[in-house]
Amino acid sequence: MNSINLNLIMAFSLALLGVLIYRTHLMSTLLCLEGMMLSLFILMALVISYFHMSSASMAPLILLVFSACEAGVGLALLVKISASHGNDYVQNLNLLQC
């Protein structure tokens, strides 16, 4: 395993660890999820170019589009939650309320 792949796997693991540790605030969770998606994007693009899979060349772009949609929805939820509750603590949210 070369150093680029090791660094990307390490970045994904650290972002996953960040999601598990910093889950008190919604903003920090969203930032860690974005780091996970970006490391997956780069890793997928490198694997596809390394194995010369031209049929799967659109997969990293599709992942990037879904990542942008996830970031947009997450930020919209963050604005709505901080406007209604006054903070972005995840523990104060009750998802069963209407």
From Swiss-Prot:
GO terms for molecular function: NADH dehydrogenase (ubiquinone) activity. The keyword Electron transport applies. The keyword rRNA-binding does not apply. The chain crosses the membrane at residues 1-21, 31-51, 59-79. It catalyses: a ubiquinone + NADH + 5 H(+)(in) = a ubiquinol + NAD(+) + 4 H(+)(out). GO terms for biological process: ATP synthesis coupled electron transport. It is found in: Mitochondrion inner membrane. It holds the Pfam family Oxidored_q2. It is a multi-pass membrane protein. Its EC number is 7.1.1.2. Keywords: Electron transport, Membrane, Mitochondrion, Mitochondrion inner membrane, NAD, Respiratory chain, Translocase, Transmembrane, Transmembrane helix, Transport, Ubiquinone. GO terms for cellular component: mitochondrial inner membrane; respiratory chain complex I. Core subunit of respiratory chain NADH dehydrogenase (Complex I) which is composed of 45 different subunits. Belongs to the complex I subunit 4L family. Core subunit of the mitochondrial membrane respiratory chain NADH dehydrogenase (Complex I) which catalyzes electron transfer from NADH through the respiratory chain, using ubiquinone as an electron acceptor. Part of the enzyme membrane arm which is embedded in the lipid bilayer and involved in proton translocation. This is NADH-ubiquinone oxidoreductase chain 4L. It comes from Macrotis lagotis (Greater bilby).
